[in-house]
Amino acid sequence: LSCRHLDVAADGTVIAGYQFEGPEWESHPLICRLDTDRRFSELTLDDELTASLNHYIASVAFSRVSGNVLVTAPRGNRVLLLDAVHGNLVANLALPDAAGARCDGTGGFLVSSGQGGLYRVAPDLAIPELLASLELRWDNHLT
């Protein structure tokens, strides 16, 4: 198990994403949280969703407008939006090879794809909007 990426909210809350390199048949939480009282917890998603992430969270980005945090799972082609206070799943969106993530300042997020796409995830949680398709390969960083 290794910590791959993290982000820190304005209030000091930390959310981090893991990579689990154990046996494929084992399952482990892939997201953890350190709150402002220094309480550490791992966020548990349902087993089917956790398995679909294929043991890897790539990027983490807090919204600077809402109480949400977005995490990307490129191996599972997923973007998850979580309530940063309680860790509850707000949205589970399909996005191919979702890699980098960053808040856009309006309550939404920008997400890059390892396939060259740059997407916007709007605050209304509609299907991610393709902003650009480029002849390049994004990795896990947009900052």
Residue ranges and their predicted role:
Residues 1, 47-52, 94-100, 134-138:
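Short coil/turn segments at the loop-to-beta-strand junctions that recur within blades
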Residues 111-143:
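Blade-level signature of beta-propeller repeat domains, shared across WD40, Kelch, NHL, RCC1
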Residues 6, 60, 101, 142-143:
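Hydrophobic core register within WD40 beta-propeller blades
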Residues 11-13, 65-67, 106-108:
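Short coil/turn segments that connect the beta-strands within blades of beta-propeller domains
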Residues 15-17, 71, 111:
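Residue position within the beta-strands of beta-propeller blades
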Residues 28-37:
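Beta-propeller blade signature
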Residues 22-29, 72-76:
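Short, solvent-exposed loop/turn segments at conserved positions within beta-propeller repeat blades
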Residues 1-4, 27, 56, 75, ...:
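Beta-rich catalytic cores
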